[in-house]
Amino acid sequence: RSVQEAQERCAELRVMIPHATYASYAAVDYLEKVSSIEQLHIHIREGGSMEALDHVLRQGYHLALLRYAVEDDEHYTHYCARRGLKMEPIMDFEYSLLTNRDGPLARKEIRDLSELDKYMEILHDDFQLPGEDGGDGIRWHVNDRRRVHVSERCSQFSILQRMPTAYMWASPMPKRALEQYHLVLRKCPAQRQRMKDVLVYPDRGTLRPEEQTFVQLLHKQAALTVK
C-alpha cells in the first residue's frame, strides 16, 4: 500500500515530440493537469523520428510522436512491429505555408514552387529535408537561395511576425497560436507532400494513467488545429 500511495503522489512521464505546436500545447495541458501532484518527474524532448524511436527503445521514454512522409509508412510500421512498439495514428496532413497574416504570401496562391525563391524560408535547425543531401531532390522543395535555420520555435514565430516576406512549411496549428503571432496557414497546391503523425510506445497491454492522460490531451489538441 505504501508503494501504491507513493506512486499516486508522483507523476512520471518521458515523451518525445516533433517540432509541432499542437504537441507542445498538449504537453502544457498535461503539466496543468498534474501540477498539484506532490512529485513530478517529467521529460519533454523535441526531435526527429529516428531519435524519438531511440529514446523509446533504449533510453526509457514512455511515448514518442513520430512524423514521417506517407510513403514511408510501411518502413516505420515494420520497424515498430519488429521491436514490439504499438502505433496509434494521431493526424494525417499536408504541409501548408505559414506566413505573416499581412504579408504577400497570405494573399498569393503558389502554383510553382520556384515562386518562393524570392522570399525567405525559415527552417528548424535540425530538420532533415527528404530528398536533400544526395537524395532524389523530388520529395521536398528547398529554397537554396534564401534559407534561415532557426532552432527555437518562438524565435521562428517572431521572425515570421516581424518579416512579412518570410515563410515556413508548417503542420496544422492551434488557432490561438496563429492569432497570438499574427500568422496564417495557406494551402499550397504546388506542395503536396502528405505526412503522418503517429504515436508509438512499448506494447505492454495497457498504458499507465500518466500516459493515457497525455494521449487523450494530444488527440484533443490535434482535433483543434487549423488545417
Feature names for model-found ranges:
Residues E8-D54:
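N-terminal winged-helix
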Residues R82-E88, F93, C154-T206:
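Beta-alpha-beta core module
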Residues S24-D29, D73, D112-V142:
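Secondary-structure junction motif
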Residues Y79-E121:
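Flexible hinge/capping segments at coil-to-helix
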Residues L57-H62, D126-L185:
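Hydrophobic hinge/microswitch elements
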Residues R1-E8:
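Alpha-helical "hinge/linker" immediately C-terminal to small N-terminal DNA-binding modules
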Residues A26, T206-L218:
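Short amphipathic alpha-helical coupling segments at ligand-binding clamshell hinges
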Residues D102-D112, A190-Q193, R204-E211:
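Short helix-loop capping/hinge motifs at secondary-structure junctions, enriched
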